[in-house]
Curated annotation (Swiss-Prot):
EC number: 2.3.2.27, 5.2.1.8
Entry protein name: Peptidyl-prolyl cis-trans isomerase 4
One Pfam entry name: Rtf2
UniProt note on tissues of expression: Exclusively in the larval body wall striated muscle cells.
Catalytic function, reaction form: [protein]-peptidylproline (omega=180) = [protein]-peptidylproline (omega=0); S-ubiquitinyl-[E2 ubiquitin-conjugating enzyme]-L-cysteine + [acceptor protein]-L-lysine = [E2 ubiquitin-conjugating enzyme]-L-cysteine + N(6)-ubiquitinyl-[acceptor protein]-L-lysine
Reported function: May catalyze the cis-trans isomerization of proline imidic peptide bonds in oligopeptides thereby assisting the folding of proteins. May also function as a chaperone, playing a role in intracellular transport of proteins. May also have a protein ubiquitin ligase activity acting as an E3 ubiquitin protein ligase or as a ubiquitin-ubiquitin ligase promoting elongation of ubiquitin chains on proteins. Influences the hermaphrodite switch from spermatogenesis to oogenesis. Required for body wall muscle cell development.
Signal peptide: none
Family to which this protein belongs: Belongs to the cyclophilin-type PPIase family. PPIL2 subfamily.
PANTHER family (UniProt xref): PEPTIDYL-PROLYL CIS-TRANS ISOMERASE-RELATED (PTHR45625), RING-TYPE E3 UBIQUITIN-PROTEIN LIGASE PPIL2 (PTHR45625:SF1)
Amino acid sequence: MGKKQHQKDKLYLTTSEWKSIGGHKDDTGTRLQRAQFKRLPINHCSLSLLPFEDPVCARSGEIFDLTAIVPYLKKHGKNPCTGKPLVAKDLIHLKFDKGEDGKFRCPVTFRTFTDHSHILAIATSGNVYSHEAVQELNLKRNHLKDLLTDVPFTRADIIDLQDPNHLEKFNMEQFLHVKLDLKTSEEIKKEKDAMKDPKFYIRRMNNACKSVLDQLDKEYVPKKSSTETDETADEINAAHYSQGKVAAGFTSTVMAPVTSNKAAVLDNDTVRYSRVKKNAFVRLVTNFGPLNLELFAPKVPKACENFITHCSNGYYNNTKFHRLIKNFMLQGGDPTGTGHGGESIWDKPFSDEFISGFSHDARGVLSMANKGSNTNGSQFFITFRPCKYLDRKHTIFGRLVGGQDTLTTIEKLETEEGTDVPMVSVVIMRAEVFVDPFEEAEKEVQAERAEILKKTSKDAASLANKKAKETATKPEAVGTGVGKYMKSAAAVNKRQGKMEDVPLEAAKKTKFARAGLGDFSKW
């Protein structure tokens, strides 16, 4: 023993230990080894390579599905794994025992079969046992009778279905039908369907992971696929910013490249809400009298549209105010009358709309009831006195402008003992809408679109007329090349190679003055 003998002992798992000891080494050699050895699970058919439903086996220990092996034997007459002769009457029907969790187990020891279990089958009965049970209770005691049925058997009737020390039988790469690719189109289709399951590609999976995935398969409900429609922006719903697809396609590797920017499309609600300029007015006719309400539609459009639509379609008709608290508020809007129901016109809760200038500072404030942030539905309440502590917790969208006497009469009603339910029911018999700015905004949008369509069609017609005039005034081409629009006969003849013969004058010779002594005339 030397000094510092443990100085290299780490308190963590090193990379080399993880690869070598942990069995996670992944290099060319291990990848080649995995490619050469692909193990088939014990619960899979050796022919279809899929989980079996009616298992049978050959004397050599290969397990098949009865519906897969019988047609194969009729066609080929040999073992699809070894190539040796095999007929259907030589197949042995296997009887697997299952536990409460649905997994195969030994019917004697009750131990679940795993990839490392030594599994045997008795040919005379077809029962499947663990090697331990047969070794201890049959072979050592020389009691060669089936442990469940007492059917006699010999040692030759013991078939090795799985031996963890000899797994060559489960190597799919060595199966004859895999090597020769003796698969039918139906088998290939089944394999392709199995490959669609993500679990097909999982190399290792413990029992806990298997149970979780099985539970997920039972409870998982896929979402309905929705196809995105590429809306085209017009002059009304076009935003002042783009869709951002060019930048996303340039910076993201998962998006297709886009080279042209398009304006973002505003949703229909945003377009309509921008054209709402005046408040709405609604009357709730109760069995104690009317309640006239003013709704702040330009400031709180979502809550106001939700309330007005429910009033228009009769959603609030014959509903009760289910909650009454003196000196606090009167709550209603639930068709069930329990305080737990009611939906918005969008069939889902909508977000809060808090306006800084609005407050629960007076009697008769109309506000949305909710179960928390952004959970507004159809329920609303009217205050009996100022409740400023409700500010920025509930959306204020209106106020009482008529029917104070009715509200006072309702406030004086007694409630059931221990509850806030009025002893005398307060019922909304009907709701009347006097002014609906959202309907007017919708008509305005439709009118603007019709005007734009009319203008567009008019511009298109004028452009077509302009092109027609240009085509009519354009001279007709009489040829090609330079001067193709010239209609003179000479030009035409010139282009056609028919120039008239024009007499040419003889070229005059140029006289040059001579230098020097030509004669003696001037002497």
